């Protein structure tokens, strides 16, 4: 049974049991900033389990793509060396949100695994574990399912504390938690290992294939376990593991999904040993890298981007170990698309952009490896002992982008170890500096409890009647807010838009009987809108009647920019290509900022075409239409989703100019495109590998930018005594004149320097047969300084010459030593000596070197010290 068939069978089975099939969410969690990557099927349902999100269904099933590399769940180091560790895997899951519980969950799992209609795994090949205190689950397995008691294993608190067990799951130190039951497959006596709970449980004979979690309790801060009013179920089964069972192989790398990738990796690396562990690493890593790039992650030196960079570079290094020194990793994307493109069409859509990102990173890594190895080899040559200092490790990472695990690989090959304590200390210092210089946004709902949900009416209203449902101060629930206090007010109904989809939250006021609250920002927390601000007068209590009033001018200006962003996105795709996808945005009342995927700077003529296309749509004054529908219908309309945004069952489709722009969006917009008035692109830049950024303004601000440009043009024309129409000709004429003057000045300086150099010949001091000369000259450029040095050196014969010149408070140094004197004194050493005394640095070859410095006052003494220094060197 092929992996794709198992995936589809699982989803069909649970659909037959009343579950809604839910598509895999992005690998970048949209609802949990504490997670680097989606690492389990339940992540996209976390808010549902917490009661902060409502769905139209109470049962769900999914095949969720997951990554475990970096953070708490990190399998990277084990990948390729074990049969079952992966950076990327698919998690098959079924979920109950206060619907069915233990009995149905256990019976569903057993039926799917063992019934002839589905997987038909022999029951004698399976055993199960339950939490030691979970008599209910034990009884269901023994009495309802009929599993022999000798194959039901109770697992207690085996991790050092109460409820710390392989069979007890918790979302965190507090919150939803409960026992779990796990199903294990016996690969047979020929494989070493024992049953769960035995000393040999870490062997590979008994492998967990399905974990069924019962969210039964809510753990409080003091450790009290209170039963949840609506117990839920969260299950997970690794597709790769169950595929190994169904395909009668022991290692996940032997299943159909991996065999094609291993063959492609062997061809790309020209590896002769088809069983090499490095091929496993490469085959695994192409999956995680391709899906991460498809989900908007790009290589960088921090966060998710750095984890991606580590995975790419680890794969490339394993290719190098197999003898492949040319870029190869990006060529494997085609094989992956062939294997998984049908299940994940986004791979097909993004194939070209994924290949370009990986190829660019391979090229960058080749340069990094070359530079980093020079630094590392230099450090190793001076190493005393077997421990590479933390400072070296940190410099390699921080300055050269050299991953620590790569340094560790090289160290291991040379039987060396790393000073990780020293590295960690330096890294913590850097993080501290970043924290001190950075800014952050307060999580106002971190510890608060907010009941109910806010009804948003802001699409059609800017004011209305409401009641206060909660008040928060410093993240804690309070009953009253007094004059002058800052805090958060939650209403049952609001016209205030909460920040999401790149659009800033609304501002304005909330008016009460005898009180007024200034809304400085509006954020979303689950199903509630948090009005953040300060009480200007009076006092407010929970339950008070309120009249929220949105600042209409700010809302309208924001709407102009948001609608313009949609038109800009569409124009970018039409001009640059379909590979362009949104990578982020910021829309407020002042401007719009749009980040998108593209692999080179946008050419000026392309920017002009894009801007013109958007303005054409604005002039057409097309209606802006919204429609509510399900996700499937939206996708059929060709609607594009926003990066990093999560969507419910019902989505809002926004169309402009007919089919010109169709996107999913919950933001506020204009009624017709003509309301935007005008767009003006103010900048285009690169912010990361493969990501560009456009900033623009609309409406009156666009007119202001155009007026300012015209004012600057007129002022420049007046200054240069030309008309605006003839300004370019005038500037070109002045540039030509300036070039001619510079040539004349350079010739005069060279002539002056030449005559001065002749006068200095007599000032050279003979030291053991070497004529040494050190001089400082005024206002000579670097080229003239080199010419002077060459002339002096040639006329002096066996000599060592160093010259210095000051220009714009910066000192230039140049030194030359005749070939017959380099065994006694070196130009690089001369420059280093003087540069060290003037707050600079320098170096070069034995016969020629350059440098510089900034301490102009110290220069005379530094030049004066050269003779004594040279005597000490030459002897």
Curated annotation (Swiss-Prot):
EC nos: 6.1.1.7
The first-level EC class reads ligase
Quote the record's cofactor note: Binds 1 zinc ion per subunit.
Protein's UniProt keywords contain Protein biosynthesis: yes
Q: Which residues bind Zn(2+)?
A: 562, 566, 665, 669
Q: Name one GO cellular component term.
A: cytosol
Principal place of residence: cytoplasm
What the entry lists under SMART domains is as follows: tRNA_SAD
Reactions catalysed, semicolon-separated, are: tRNA(Ala) + L-alanine + ATP = L-alanyl-tRNA(Ala) + AMP + diphosphate
UniProt entry tagged with the keyword tRNA-binding: yes
| Keyword vocabulary terms for this entry | Aminoacyl-tRNA synthetase, ATP-binding, Cytoplasm, Ligase, Metal-binding, Nucleotide-binding, Protein biosynthesis, RNA-binding, tRNA-binding, Zinc
Q: A GO molecular-function term, please?
A: zinc ion binding
List the GO biological process terms.
alanyl-tRNA aminoacylation; negative regulation of DNA-templated transcription
Q: Which PROSITE patterns match?
A: AA_TRNA_LIGASE_II_ALA (PS50860)
Q: Which cofactor does it need?
A: Zn(2+)
What is stated about domains? Consists of three domains; the N-terminal catalytic domain, the editing domain and the C-terminal C-Ala domain. The editing domain removes incorrectly charged amino acids, while the C-Ala domain, along with tRNA(Ala), serves as a bridge to cooperatively bring together the editing and aminoacylation centers thus stimulating deacylation of misacylated tRNAs.
Summary of the function given for this chain in its UniProt record: Catalyzes the attachment of alanine to tRNA(Ala) in a two-step reaction: alanine is first activated by ATP to form Ala-AMP and then transferred to the acceptor end of tRNA(Ala). Also edits incorrectly charged Ser-tRNA(Ala) and Gly-tRNA(Ala) via its editing domain.
Q: Which family does it belong to?
A: Belongs to the class-II aminoacyl-tRNA synthetase family.
What protein is this chain from? Alanine--tRNA ligase
């Amino acid at each position: 049974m092929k992996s794709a068939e198992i995936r589809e069978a699982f989803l069909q089975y649970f659909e037959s049991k009343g579950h809604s099939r839910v598509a895999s969410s992005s690998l970048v969690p949209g609802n949990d900033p504490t997670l680097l990557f989606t690492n389990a099927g339940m992540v996209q349902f976390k808010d549902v389990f917490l009661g902060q999100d409502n769905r139209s269904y109470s049962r769900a099933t999914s095949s969720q793509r997951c990554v475990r590399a970096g953070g708490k769940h990190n399998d990277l180091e084990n990948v390729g060396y074990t049969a079952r560790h992966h950076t990327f895997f698919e998690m098959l899951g079924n979920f109950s949100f206060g619907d069915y519980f233990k009995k149905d969950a256990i019976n569903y799992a057993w039926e799917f695994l063992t019934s002839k209609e589905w997987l038909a795994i022999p029951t004698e090949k399976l055993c199960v574990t339950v939490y030691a205190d979970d008599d209910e689950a034990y009884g269901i397995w023994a009495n309802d399912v009929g599993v022999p008691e000798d194959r039901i294993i109770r697992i207690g608190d085996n991790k050092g504390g109460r409820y710390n067990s392989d069979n007890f799951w918790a979302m965190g130190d507090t919150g939803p938690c409960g026992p779990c039951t796990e199903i294990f497959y016996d690969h047979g006596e020929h494989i070493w290992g024992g049953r769960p709970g035995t000393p040999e449980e870490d062997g590979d004979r008994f492998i967990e294939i399905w974990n069924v979690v019962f969210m039964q309790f809510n753990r409080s801060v003091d450790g009290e376990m209170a039963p949840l009013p609506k117990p839920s179920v969260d299950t997970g089964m690794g597709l790769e593991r169950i595929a190994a069972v169904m395909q009668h192989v022991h290692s996940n790398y032997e299943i159909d999904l991996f065999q094609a990738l291993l063959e492609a990796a062997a061809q790309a690396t020209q590896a002769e040993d088809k069983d090499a562990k490095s091929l496993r690493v490469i085959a695994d890593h192409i999956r995680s890298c391709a899906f991460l790039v498809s989900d908007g992650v790009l290589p960088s030196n921090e966060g998710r981007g750095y984890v991606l960079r580590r995975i790419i570079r680890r794969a490339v290094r394993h290719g190098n170990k197999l003898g492949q020194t040319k870029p190869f990793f990006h060529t494997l994307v085609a094989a992956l698309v062939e294997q998984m493109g049908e299940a994940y069409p986004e791979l097909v859509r993004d194939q070209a952009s994924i290949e370009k990102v990986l190829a660019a990173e391979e090229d960058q890594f080749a340069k990094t490896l070359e530079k980093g190895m020079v630094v590392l080899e230099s450090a190793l040559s001076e190493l005393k002992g077997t421990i590479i200092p933390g400072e070296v490790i940190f410099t390699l990472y921080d300055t050269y982008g050299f991953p620590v695990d790569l340094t560790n690989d090289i160290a291991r090959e040379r039987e060396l170890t790393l000073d990780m304590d020293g590295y960690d200390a330096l890294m913590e210092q850097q993080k501290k500096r970043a924290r001190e210089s950075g800014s952050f946004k307060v999580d106002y709902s971190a510890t608060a409890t907010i009941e109910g949900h806010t009804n948003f009416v802001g699409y059609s209203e800017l004011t209305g009647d409401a009641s206060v449902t909660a008040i928060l101060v410093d993240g804690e629930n309070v009953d009253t807010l007094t004059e002058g206090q800052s805090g958060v007010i939650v209403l049952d109904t609001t016209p205030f838009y909460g920040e999401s989809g790149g659009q800033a939250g609304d501002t304005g006021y909330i008016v009460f009987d005898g009180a007024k609250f200034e809304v400085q920002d509006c954020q979303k927390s689950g199903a509630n809108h948090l009005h953040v601000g300060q009480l200007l007068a009076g006092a407010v209590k929970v339950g008070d009647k309120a009249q929220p009033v949105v600042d209409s001018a700010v809302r309208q200006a924001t709407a102009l920019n948001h609608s313009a962003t949609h038109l800009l996105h569409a124009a970018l795709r039409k001009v640059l290509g379909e590979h362009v996808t949104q990578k982020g945005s910021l829309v407020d009342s002042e401007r719009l900022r749009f980040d998108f995927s593209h692999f080179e700077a946008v050419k000026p003529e392309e920017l002009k075409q894009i801007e013109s296309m958007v303005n054409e749509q604005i002039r057409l004054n097309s209606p802006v239409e919204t429609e509510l529908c399900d996700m499937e219908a939206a996708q059929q309309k060709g609607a594009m989703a926003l990066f990093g945004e999560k969507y419910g069952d019902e989505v809002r489709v926004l169309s402009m100019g007919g089919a010109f722009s169709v996107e999913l969006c919950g933001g506020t917009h204009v009624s017709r495109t003509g309301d935007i008035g005008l767009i003006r692109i103010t900048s285009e830049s690169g912010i990361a590998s493969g990501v560009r950024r456009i900033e623009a303004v609309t409406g009156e601000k666009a007119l202001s930018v155009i007026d300012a440009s015209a004012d600057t043009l007129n002022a420049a024309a007046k200054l240069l005594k030309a008309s605006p129409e003839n300004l370019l000709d005038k500037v070109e004429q002045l540039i030509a004149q300036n070039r001619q003057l510079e040539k004349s000045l350079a010739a005069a300086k060279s002539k002056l320097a030449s005559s001065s150099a002749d006068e200095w010949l007599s000032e050279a001091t003979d030291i053991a047969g070497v004529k040494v000369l050190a001089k400082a000259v005024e206002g000579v450029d670097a080229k003239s300084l080199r010419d002077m040095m060459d002339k002096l050196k040639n006329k002096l014969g066996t000599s060592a010459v160093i010259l210095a010149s000051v220009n714009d408070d910066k000192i230039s140094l140049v030194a030359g030593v005749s070939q017959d004197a380099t065994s006694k004194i070196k130009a690089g050493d001369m420059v280093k000596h003087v540069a060290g005394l003037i707050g600079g640095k320098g170096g070069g070859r034995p016969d020629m070197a350059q440098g510089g410095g900034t301490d102009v006052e110290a220069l005379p003494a530094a030049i004066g010290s050269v003779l004594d220094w040279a005597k000490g060197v030459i002897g």
